[in-house]
Amino acid sequence: MFAAICLDEANENQPVYITLKLEPLDGDFLRQQYEDIIPGYYMNKVHWNSIKPDGEVPDELLMEMLDKSYALVLHSFSKKRQQEILLTTYCGLDCTNCEYKEPCKCNGCVATKGMPFHAEETPCPVAACVMQKGISFCGECTEFPCQLLTDYSNDTEHGDNPPGARIAACKMIKCLLEKK
């Protein structure tokens, strides 16, 4: 968990507070700047802070705090667990909101060992390459971004929207896994 949302049942379950993890010094500083940021409800008050979402805290700052909270919590896990959280595909494609996930019972090529719903008899070539090299995802490859991944990412019919999105995702995942 990197955030908790406290809801107001009397007010149609509108958020009363969003509780996020922050570095202790950042939390202290922000609590001094904004009265809508208080020590976290029901949490370790050193690291967790509750923010009134419709208060005086600027949306940009709230988004930045969400990102930092996610990174702090993610990096508290082992590298193996981080990969389990971040990687559902070998190529960086984000399958979490795929319209075929539920009807086709597909959890991405990592879970299906390279055989997602669209791979009928042979594994996806990108997944097969990653598995053959014994790496976790394309971003760990010494040839990244290779021609195979680039071709998949920029394919006009079945590629990314926008083109190159899975390459950018691999770069981001690689950065997240390297930070510690």
Model-derived segments and spans:
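Short, conserved beta-strand/beta-arch hydrophobic-aromatic motifs that form part
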Residues: 1-45, 56
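Structured alpha/beta reader/binder surfaces that contact nucleic acids or chromatin modification marks
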Residues: 2, 28-32, 71-74, 116-117, ...
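Active-site donor-binding loop signature of nucleotide-sugar glycosyltransferases
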Residues: 7, 53, 143
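Short, conserved beta-strand segments within well-ordered enzyme catalytic domains
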Residues: 19-21, 50-52, 140
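Amphipathic alpha-helical interface surfaces
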Residues: 26, 30-33, 47, 61-65, ...
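Short coil/turn segments at secondary-structure boundaries
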Residues: 39, 53-60, 129-132, 137
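Well-ordered alpha/beta subsegment
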Residues: 42-85
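Cysteine-centered metal-binding/redox modules
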Residues: 83-180
